[in-house]
Curated annotation (Swiss-Prot):
Phylogenetic lineage: Eukaryota, Fungi, Dikarya, Ascomycota, Pezizomycotina
Record's keyword annotation contains Lyase: no
Organism of this sequence: Aspergillus rugulosus (Emericella rugulosa)
Summary of the function given for this chain in its UniProt record: Isopropyl malate dehydrogenase; part of the gene cluster that mediates the de novo generation of L-homotyrosine from acetyl-CoA and 4-hydroxyphenyl-pyruvate. L-homotyrosine is a building block of echinocandin B, a fungal lipidated cyclic hexapeptide that acts as an antifungal agent. This is followed by isomerization of 2-(4-hydroxy-benzyl)-malate to 3-(4-hydroxybenzyl)-malate by htyD.
SUBUNIT field: Homodimer.
EC number(s) on file: 1.1.1.85
Protein name: Isopropyl malate dehydrogenase htyC
Keywords from the UniProt entry: Amino-acid biosynthesis, Branched-chain amino acid biosynthesis, Leucine biosynthesis, Magnesium, Manganese, Metal-binding, NAD, NADP, Oxidoreductase
SMART domains referenced in this protein's UniProt entry, alphabetically: Iso_dh
C-alpha cells in the first residue's frame, strides 16, 4: 500500500523539494509526496497583508510536516507587522516545542572550513535541543516609556514546559546504543526560571524516567567557553532553555564553518508516543534569507537538504531514506562539490543536482 504524505512548503532555496522528488521516484511503490506551497514572512505580507495567511496555517496543521525556507529581510524592516512573526504564529499553531539542531561535520574534509582549529573541532558531534515555548521571549514585557530609563522582560517557565523538552531529550538519548549522554545548560547559580527550576525539573525527569542516560549540568557561560575551545567535551545531546538555546546554537554554527551547512527540526511531539515513529514538525535550514546574495544562485542548499533528511527521519518514519540523503550530501562534498561559503564555486542548483545524482547512484548500486 502506497503511503501519502502531505507536506506544506514555504519556499526558500529549492534544494529540499528537489531532493523530495528524487526520494519519491526511488520509493514510488511505497510513498507519494503531495507538496502544497504557501507564502510566509515578507512574501506573505506583500500578497495577503499578513506574515502568514489563515489558509496556510490550516494546511500546515493538517500536513504530515512543514518544510520552511528563510524568512524576512531588509525590504520589510519598516513593515507595520514584523514579518518574522509569521514563523512564531506557525510554531504556536503547531505547538512546536523542541528545536533540534545537529552540529557536526557531514564530511571530515569540512574541518578545514571551521572557524576553530582543525585539531580542536575534529570529532565534534552535538545535538542541541532548545525549548521553544517558554522563557524570557514569552514572559511579560514592559517597554521603556520613551525616556530610555527602564524596561523589563520576565523570564518565566512552568514545570510542564521543562519536563516535556527533557522527555524529548531523554527519548532521543535512549534511541542510540549506548544511550547518548545529555548535558543540560542553565544559570542555576543566579536565576530562578532558566536556572534552578530548569535544573531541578531536568534532574528529576531524566533520573526517574531515563535512569540509563548519563546526565550532567553545566552553567551556560561555562558551556559557551567550552564550545569555543573544546567543543567535543559537549558531544552528545545539549539541552537548554529558549534564550540560552537561541544564543548557544548560533555560536555552535562556527564549528562546521557556515550557517548554510546546518539543518534544524522543530518537533511538535515526542517520537515514539501515541503517534508511533512519526511526529509533526517544522524543518528549516539554520541560515537566514541572506539578502546580500539572494538571487545569485550561490546560497548553500546543504542545510535545506539535510532538513529534508530530518523530516524523513522524524515525521515520515523513513530512516533509510534519511540516511541515503545524508550519505549523498557527504559524497558530493567528498568529490569537491562546495558552494562559495565553504571555499568552492558550486552553485545552489549544481549542488542540488549532484546530490540527486548521488541518490540515483545509490539506487543503481543496490
Amino acid at each position: 500500500m502506497v503511503k501519502t504524505f502531505d507536506i506544506v512548503v514555504f519556499p526558500g532555496d529549492y534544494g529540499g523539494p528537489e531532493v523530495l522528488g528524487e526520494i519519491q521516484s526511488q520509493y514510488e511503490q511505497e510513498v507519494t509526496f503531495n507538496l502544497k506551497y504557501h507564502l510566509l514572512g515578507g512574501a506573505s505580507f506583500d500578497a495577503h497583508g499578513t506574515p502568514i495567511a489563515d489558509e496556510a496555517l490550516t494546511d500546515a496543521k493538517a500536513a504530515s510536516a512543514v518544510l520552511l525556507g528563510a524568512v524576512g529581510g531588509p525590504a520589510w524592516d519598516k513593515a507595520p507587522i514584523p514579518v518574522e512573526s509569521g514563523l512564531g504564529r506557525l510554531r504556536k499553531a503547531l505547538d512546536a516545542f523542541g528545536n533540534l539542531r545537529p552540529v557536526k561535520f557531514i564530511h571530515p574534509i569540512l574541518t578545514e572550513t571551521s572557524a576553530l582549529k582543525e585539531q580542536v573541532c575534529r570529532g565534534a558531534d552535538l545535538l542541541i535541543i532548545r525549548e521553544l515555548t517558554g522563557g524570557i521571549y514569552y514572559g511579560a514585557r514592559q517597554e521603556h516609556d520613551g525616556t530610555l530609563n527602564a524596561a523589563s522582560d520576565l523570564d518565566h517557565y512552568e514545570r510542564a514546559q521543562v519536563q516535556r523538552v527533557a522527555r524529548l531529550a531523554g527519548t532521543l538519548a535512549m534511541s542510540t546504543q549506548p544511550p547518548t549522554p545529555i548535558t543540560s545548560l542553565d544559570k542555576a547559580n543566579l536565576l530562578a526560571a532558566c536556572g534552578r527550576l530548569w535544573r531541578g525539573v531536568v534532574e528529576e525527569t531524566i533520573r526517574r524516567e531515563f535512569p540509563d542516560v548519563e546526565l550532567k549540568h553545566m552553567l551556560i557561560d561555562t558551556a559557551a567557553m567550552t564550545l569555543g575551545c573544546r567543543p567535543t567535551k559537549l558531544n552528545g545531546i545539549v539541552l537548554t532553555s529558549n534564550m540560552f538555546g537561541d544564543i548557544i546554537s548560533d555560536q555552535a554554527s562556527a564549528i562546521p564553518g557556515s550557517l548554510g551547512l546546518l539543518p534544524s527540526a522543530s518537533l511538535c511531539a515526542i517520537p515514539g508516543g501515541e503517534s508511533g515513529g512519526c511526529v509533526h514538525g517544522i524543518y528549516e535550514p539554520v541560515h537566514g534569507s541572506a539578502p546580500d546574495i539572494a538571487g545569485q544562485g550561490i546560497i548553500n542548499p546543504t542545510g535545506m537538504i539535510l532538513s529534508v533528511a530530518m523530516m524523513l527521519r522524524y515525521s515520515l518514519d523513513m530512516p533509510a531514506a534519511a540516511t541515503a540523503v545524508e550519505t549523498a550530501v557527504s559524497r558530493v562534498i567528498e568529490r569537491g562539490g562546495r558552494t562559495r561559503d565553504v571555499g568552492g564555486t558550486t552553485s545552489t542548483a549544481e549542488f542540488g543536482d549532484q546530490v540527486v545524482a548521488c541518490l540515483r547512484e545509490n539506487t543503481e548500486d543496490k
